Amino acid sequence: MRSLRGAMMVVAALATASALAEAPPNSQPNPFRTVENWFKLPAGRMWGSTSAVDIDRGGTSIWVAERCGANSCAGKMDPPILKFDQSGTLVKSFGGGMFVFPHGIAVDKDGNVWVTDGQGREGKGHQVFKFSPDGEVLMTLGKAGVAGDGPDTFNQPDDVAIAPNGDIFVSDGHTPAMGNARVMKFTKDGKFIKQWGRHGSGPGEFEVPHALAFDSRGRLFVGDRANNRIQIFDQEGNFIDQWKQFSRPSGVYIDNHDVIYVTDSESTDKPGYGYNPGWRRGIRVGSAKDGSVAAFIPDPLSPTADGKLPGTSAAEGVAADAAGNVYGAEVGPKTLKKYVRK
């Protein structure tokens, strides 16, 4: 991690975050190599679409929420919440029969696991669950199977993040120009405090607030995906800044050293959904302090020069462990990949 932080200091000295945003940072070095098939599932269990990955407080255990061997857990009893150790061995699983569309995950300082259910069907979904490390349900936010825009309902909740004081933040809304486009704040006991956001592209407006993360200063980073930017707020919802140099953010992760990891799983040169010309998909690594971009893990399925897509999205969710290994959760290829230093 020392060399990566050093590289970010060099980048910061050469350009400010605003200057970096002028041209797509597609040519940063890739100091990582990909480890395929590192995570081991039980015999007969197949990976489903996977957008959610996080690391526990110890920085070693990898928590994942996958979609039951498909792109939905509806009608399935497979436990979608999985815990892996550093050898890639599955050591715990739970949540079977509870979810429709596991989407976002967060592990708090006490080791509790928070998971969003981003769709609704058959009386399930549109909720946020808090589990103990052993899978006991400790809290439920939202109404099962009910999509809404009130203080006690969600409509396609994307992600959840827990502030240092225990306050709960949920980003709500997965469809551009439709449904919700907001960030909601709750007390640690689940009492609604406030919300902010609406559809749009101005400060504090969102089009798919897809990912949440806190930096060491307690600032909330929101991956405003369909607006091709990250927005930064204080915990009262006051706008601080926006960054576009990390491209079209599907996943955002910030480690204890304020190294930021951002996935772009959608950018394409082709007009239409995902239009973000000139930007390659992949994982950009930089500094949450100044917005500099130091490294880039390119998506092997990234659009070609003529805008054609040779495949679907790769890394959508992202996390990094205490050793600096990076984990990419993939929706289209239905897998979880590990990236280690070369």
Where are these regions (language model features)?
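Positively charged n-region of N-terminal signal peptides that target proteins for export
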Residues: 1-6
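Eukaryotic scaffold repeat domains enriched in small/polar residues
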Residues: 22-342
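Bacterial N-terminal signal peptides
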Residues: 7-17
